[in-house]
Curated annotation (Swiss-Prot):
This is Kinesin-like protein KIF6. ATP binds at G97, Q98, T99, G100, S101, G102, K103, T104. One of its GO terms (biological process) is microtubule-based movement. Disulfide bonds: none annotated.
Length: 814
């Protein structure tokens, strides 16, 4: 049993701007406990008589200043706790502080650089490294990840649900047994045999966490998360099992609503966060008071889950994260006061050992059977009754495991019962005979199959040859198509930089018959149409959300928009930097692999030389009837020293390669996490853009329906400006001079003719024109053509016939 108080540490976050830095000092006297002094200057607006306290001093186990890196924090805080967990004690590390003070960065780490890894990934690396070194015990590791959001628990690692939102995850409920032990229903435990599997589970859970932007923090975690490592160990053949668990807790940040001014959904989240932290503080105060008979653990889910960590069988450590900017000094002082109360709590950590009853029963049964066999051998008693079915099945299982065991020293232990010995010999004989019969049947069947398959081989070869030829043709066609598309894309990028005013001032409208500017038509026809994806047409609006999904389901326009969004995103620089680092690590790993192979071959060569040298000396001594000289051979000693040097070099490079492997996998996880975040933000942005375009844009006629289209001069100007911004994406806007606009999607090759003007729109027209003049007559040169003469003539005839029908309909209605 280990009795100790909760260890408290402080970490100071660097300020965003230096002029916002508050006044503080750190006293790290070796004879005394380090202390942090915060100076809160008096406000002159409070008047001349102001007795407000200016200096606040707090003591911690250690204080990490702004320049402390993640490695230093892990070595001094998490490593001792992880070592006690390996020894069989429970451990907890939790970070407490206001929002934006660096709790998530300390516990989980940053997503930008590998050196920014937090306590969780570094602890996983340390634990699995120690497990590999200790081969005297059998270890089993399980991972769980719990999120508490608005007083509801969610399992972030549930494999049975594909979570697109937090509500899709299964809810975790708290159950309590008669011994007042807490059990979490619906919280899954995932076994992790390697560090890579554990990091993958951490990455999976982090992608499902609730993160939102607040005035204090752009990526504020809006929930409490508890990452738990369950570790069990036992020695081979022993019935004693050690269990330990390590809670790594990332609390949501407290914030003063009056200061931040949040509202709506963020306000609801802030209420739940502040309430749960208030209940946590109540538990801390109750535990620090010696004569309190009741501890209010059940007030919140978080205090119920952390019952052992706060006042029970656990070695607990707290990290107070401080943001010592001028505007945050009050919250930082409050955090330090909370830490001082936490330091008064004393826990009693007990070694979690238990005896597995199943292993004890199995060991005792085996011991009883051995004693019975020894007794039968001594007394010479022979049993005559037949073996039971259970005994026969047990003997056959023993024989099967004996035959499958590759160990040459394995034994078939059936005791001194001659009935069992005879049955084992009979069973082995039966297995041998069955194997011979099976081999004979297999040989005969193979000979028959060869005779039958000879006529079919030629036909099968011919079919395979035809299929191969067909696949080659398909590949050639696809390659040609790819080259053409690449050429179109390059020309589109080249022509996309044309000045828009020159395009509008051009005398000839686009898609003129016989237009020699084929590159212009290629640009308009090959540029991805944002109109196809924003879908202002009513019929396509229902398909919008289906297109906003994973990258492989995106349309061409959506993919281009995603590339632009990714290029302009703030995380693109981080992703590119990680790509460069990953490329360097891959190159280094490749070079190390080659060096390791060279060292391995050199070690083998040196061993062979030493062996040959030794054989030559022995042969020389035998031929000359001389004993082997006692003095060591200098050449052999030199070879042995080279061999040892190569072994050390090989071991060093191999260790570095393993570290590189872990770093590469962590970088890949960071990149995957950034890509998932980028994808989610793009989906939100894309949906907002599509919704805004549908709300702000007027009704546009489809090919099958025509409706009156009325606009004021202001709305006409806004609509024209909106569509002119989309002209580079493939939209063509034409003002017919009657208060109407014709919109055609030149990529989709669809023409949306203007409807007949209503009488109201004719009154609004500046110049009165005859009714037949108001019918839009699209110039032939503005019709998008294909280049084929027959097809183009059919298109022109169809447009003329349609305009004639529209004109007759308008005349008939008037």
């Amino acid at each position: 049993m280990v009795k100790q108080t909760i260890q408290i540490f402080a970490r100071v976050k660097p300020p965003v701007r230096k002029h916002q830095q508050g006044i503080y000092s750190i006293d790290e006297d070796e004879k005394l406990i380090p202390s942090l002094e915060i100076i809160l200057p008096r406000d002159l607006a409070d008047g001349f008589v102001n007795n407000k306290r200016e200096s606040y001093k707090f003591k911690f186990q250690r204080i990490f200043d702004q320049d402390a890196n993640q490695e230093t924090v892990f070595e001094n805080i998490a490593k001792p706790v992880a070592g006690s967990v390996l020894a069989g004690y429970n451990g907890t590390i939790f970070a407490y502080g206001q929002t934006g003070s660096g709790k998530t960065f300390t516990i989980t780490g940053g997503a930008e650089r590998y050196s920014d890894r937090g306590i969780i990934p570094r602890t996983l690396s340390y634990i699995f490294e120690q497990l590999q070194k200790d081969s005297s015990k059998i270890y089993t590791t399980h991972i769980s990840y719990l999120e508490i959001y608005n007083e509801c628990g969610y399992d972030l690692l549930d494999p049975r649900h594909e979570a697109s939102s937090l509500e899709d995850l299964p809810k975790v409920t708290i159950l309590e047994d008669p011994d007042q032990n807490i059990h979490l229903k619906n919280l899954t435990l995932h076994q992790a045999t390697t560090e890579e599997e554990a990091l993958n589970l951490l990455f999976l859970g982090d992608t499902n966490r609730m993160i939102a932007e607040t005035p204090m923090n752009q990526a504020s975690t809006r929930s409490h998360c508890i990452f738990t490592i369950h570790l069990s160990s036992k020695e081979p053949g022993s019935a004693t099992v050690r269990h330990a668990k390590l809670h790594l807790v990332d609390l949501a940040g407290s914030e003063r609503v009056a200061k931040t001014g949040v509202g709506g959904h963020l306000l609801t989240e802030a209420k739940y966060i502040n309430l749960s932290l208030h209940y946590l503080e109540q538990v801390i105060i109750a535990l620090s008071e010696k004569h309190r008979s009741h501890i209010p653990y059940r007030n919140s889910m978080m205090t119920s889950v952390l019952r052992d960590s706060l006042g029970g069988n656990c070695m607990t450590t707290m990290i107070a994260t401080l943001s010592l900017e001028k505007r945050n000094l009050d919250e930082s002082i409050s955090t330090c006061r909370f830490a001082q109360r936490v330091a008064l709590i004393k826990n009693e950590a007990v070694l979690n050992e238990e005896i597995n009853p199943r292993l004890v029963i199995k060991r005792l049964q085996k011991e009883i059977q051995e004693l019975k066999d020894e007794l039968a051998m001594v007394t010479g008693e022979q049993r005559t009754e037949a073996l039971t079915e259970a005994e026969l099945l047990q003997l056959e299982k023993l024989i099967t495991s004996f035959l499958e065991d590759q160990d040459s020293d394995s034994r078939l232990e059936v005791g001194a019962d001659m009935r069992k010995v005879h049955h084992c010999f009979h069973h082995l004989k039966k297995l041998l005979n069955d194997k011979k019969i099976l081999e004979n049947n297999t040989v005969s069947s193979e000979s028959k199959d060869q005779d039958c398959q000879e006529p079919l081989k030629e036909e099968e070869y011919r079919k395979l040859r035809d299929i191969l030829k067909q696949r080659d043709n398909e590949i050639n066609i696809l390659v040609n198509m790819l080259k053409k598309e690449k050429k179109k894309a390059q020309e589109a990028l080249h022509l996309a930089g044309m000045d828009r005013r020159e395009f509008r001032q051009s005398q000839s409208p686009p898609f003129r018959l016989g237009n020699p500017e084929e590159g212009q038509r290629m640009r308009l026809s090959s540029a991805p149409s944002q109109a196809q994806d924003f879908s202002i047409l009513g019929k396509r609006s229902s398909l919008l959300h289906k297109k906003i999904g994973m990258r492989e389901e995106m349309s061409l326009g959506c993919q281009e928009a995603f590339e632009i969004f990714k290029r302009d995103h703030a995380d693109s620089v981080t992703i590119d930097d990680n790509k460069q680092i990953l490329k360097q690590r891959f190159s280094e790993a490749k070079a190390l692999g080659e060096s390791i192979n060279e060292a391995r071959s050199k070690i083998g060569h040196l061993k062979e030389e030493i062996t040959q040298r030794h054989i030559q000396q022995v042969a020389l001594g035998i031929s000359e009837n001389m004993a082997v000289p006692l003095m060591p051979d200098q050449q052999e000693e030199k070879l042995r020293s080279q061999l040892e040097e190569e072994k050390r070099r090989y071991k060093t490079m191999f260790t570095r390669l393993k570290a590189l492997k872990v770093e590469i996998e962590h970088l890949q996880l960071l990149m995957d996490k950034a890509k998932v975040k980028l994808q989610k933000e793009f989906e939100v942005w894309w949906a907002e853009e599509a919704t805004n375009l549908q709300v702000n844009s007027p009704a546009v006629n489809s090919l099958d329906h025509t409706k009156p289209f009325l606009q004021t001069s202001d709305s006409q100007h806004e609509w024209s400006q909106l569509l002119s911004n989309k002209s580079s994406g493939g939209w063509e806007v034409q003002d017919q001079g009657t208060g109407r606009f014709d919109v055609c999607d030149v990529n989709a090759r669809k023409i949306l003719p203007s409807p007949c003007p209503s009488p109201h729109s004719q009154k609004q027209s500046s110049t009165s024109t005859p009714l037949e003049d108001s019918i839009p007559k699209r110039p032939v040169s503005s019709i998008p053509l294909t280049g084929d003469s027959q097809t183009d003539s059919d298109i022109i005839a169809f447009i003329k016939a349609r305009q004639s029908i529209l004109q007759k309909q308008c005349l008939g209605s008037n």
